[in-house]
A protein has these predicted regions:
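Short acidic-glycine loop/turn motifs at beta-strand connectors
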Residues: 24-30, 56, 63-68, 75, ...
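Active-site-adjacent loop/helix segments that line or gate small-molecule/cofactor pockets in enzymes
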Residues: 14-25, 48, 161-209, 313-340
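Extended Lys/Arg-rich, glycine-bearing segments that form polyanion-binding/interaction patches
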Residues: 6, 75-78, 83, 89-201, ...
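Conserved phosphate/anionic-ligand binding catalytic regions in large, soluble enzymes, centered on
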Residues: 44-61, 285-289
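Short, Gly/Pro- and small/polar-rich lid/capping loops
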Residues: 1-37
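Flexible, glycine/charged-enriched surface loops at secondary-structure junctions
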Residues: 96-97, 113-122, 206-209, 261-269, ...
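Conserved catalytic-core subdomain
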Residues: 2-11, 15-17, 158, 212, ...
Length: 340
């Protein structure tokens, strides 16, 4: 039975659910793990996660399809990306099967928090890992916890996705050969000052350039960019310091195999921005957030698609991917994983 939640007015925030998953790594191995009810995490004051930010995380969603099943979208890619993040921060990896089973268990246990089909809402899933034993010298922790919690969230955009205004920022998101390609908490902490500053000046997001030359487009603090050329190609930035977005990867496939578009994954010079017909940010939360205006050091770029609605090609990409996720359009094999 669904929880007594006003699904039509559900915001995008944290709502505590009944169960979460926990498994502990100690003496070189993971324990059996399982569901728990306590939403609090109790750790020593000197835990590695507190002292040296040794934590990584993922984000995905569960939702009802039109035929009444609860599903997740490409969770195997989240498992793989989590392990890439773990390896970079000298943390133990988690077998893909354990990751997928943890996600399935916690979603099944909280199925009453999955919003009904058609509301645009979903059950957000947050897997994360952290160093838990006391570490006073700068070194990796020896003990870790992998946890998964869930929270029901409303649609990222109430009333539809309207184009946003962003800026090219002077701040750097990630250094060459740094940690920009992984989903680590430290990367997001570094972006907080820049996004707070952007919001105070009327911008929804920052566009980061590469730190080495400050000439090529990277991403925002939490989303990848997609661009549509005037002749209908999908172009996405290529860089070793960009987080490999699962949504972007999926949109590239949809563009080529469902919409017959030419797809280019390559470095994008900032001087090209004025020539694109449509722009957007992509990620798990919003899928696509259209961009209508960019303020640059050289002046303002008004995207031809405008500030009123999502551009026509971006809208096709958005609608097609959403249709795949919700069972309205046939999905490639393995993309949509049934939970129950």
């Amino acid at each position: 039975m669904s929880k007594n939640i006003d699904w039509d007015n559900l915001g995008f925030g944290y709502v505590e659910t009944d169960y979460r998953y926990l498994t502990t790594y100690k003496d070189g191995k993971w324990d059996e793990g399982g569901l728990i009810t306590d939403a609090n995490v109790v750790l020593n004051e000197c835990a590695g996660v507190f002292q040296y930010a040794q934590t990584v995380f993922e984000g995905l969603k569960a939702y009802y399809t039109k035929d009444g099943h609860i599903v997740c979208f490409r969770p195997d890619l989240n498992a793989d990306r989590l392990n890439q993040s773990c390896e970079r921060l000298v943390m133990p990896t988690l077998p893909e099967g354990r990751f997928l089973e943890a996600v399935k268990e916690v979603v099944k246990a909280n199925k009453d928090f999955v919003p009904p089909y058609g509301h645009g809402a979903s059950l957000y899933i947050r897997p994360y890992m952290m160093g838990t034993n006391s570490v006073i010298g700068v070194k990796p922790a020896d003990e870790y916890q992998f946890r998964v919690f869930t929270t029901p969230v409303g649609p990222y955009f109430k009333g539809g996705a309207k184009p946003i205004k962003i800026r090219i920022t002077d701040f750097d998101r990630a250094a060459p050969h740094g940690t920009g390609h992984i989903k680590a908490g430290l990367n997001y902490a570094m972006s907080l000052y820049a996004i707070t500053d952007a919001h105070s000046k009327g911008y929804a997001e920052n566009m980061y350039l590469d730190a080495a030359t400050r000439t090529h487009v990277e991403e925002t603090g939490g989303a990848n960019f997609i661009f549509i050329t005037k002749d209908g190609k999908l172009v996405t930035p290529k860089s070793d310091s960009i987080l490999p977005s699962i949504t972007r990867r999926s949109l590239m496939y949809v563009a080529e195999h469902y919409l017959g578009m030419t797809v280019e994954h390559r470095p994008i010079h900032k001087d090209e921005l004025k020539d694109f017909a449509e722009m957007g940010l992509c990620g798990t939360a919003a899928v696509i957030s259209p961009v209508g205006q960019i303020d640059t050091p050289e002046g303002t770029i008004n995207v031809p698609a405008g500030m009123d609605d999502m551009g026509p090609i971006t809208k096709k990409l958005y609608d097609t991917l959403l249709g795949i996720q919700h069972g309205e359009i046939e999905a490639p094999e393995g993309w949509v994983v049934k939970i129950c």
